[in-house]
Amino acid sequence: MPLISLLQEEGLVDAVDAACERVLFTSEQCGRVLRAAAAAGVPTRLHGDQLSDGGGAALAAAHGALTCDHCEHTNDAGARAMAEAGTVAVLLPAASYFSQETVRPDVAMLR
């Protein structure tokens, strides 16, 4: 993805976000974006596991993302992978509230 490299060279980007949900982008699509950002030396963040357990936490960890945002449906393996990779879980309670999400993230698991 030449655009990421160009933006990095111009000093116009400090991180790249990807959104991994079945109604948004697949893990394969997000993986391409995360790899391109890493190749350009740009830190990454992932929005995932908000609406379902789509493996967003594990994907974020596998690519060394700074954060995985939302995490309402993150499973134990994803949480462990993030802990090992140093990827921080960012909880966004206002997003859950406004989307009327009834599932709450397992805060104890994510600590």
Where are the predicted features?
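Metal-coordinating catalytic core of metallo-dependent amide/deamination hydrolases
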Residues: 1-55
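Active-site-adjacent C-terminal substructures of enzyme catalytic domains
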Residues: 43-44, 53-111
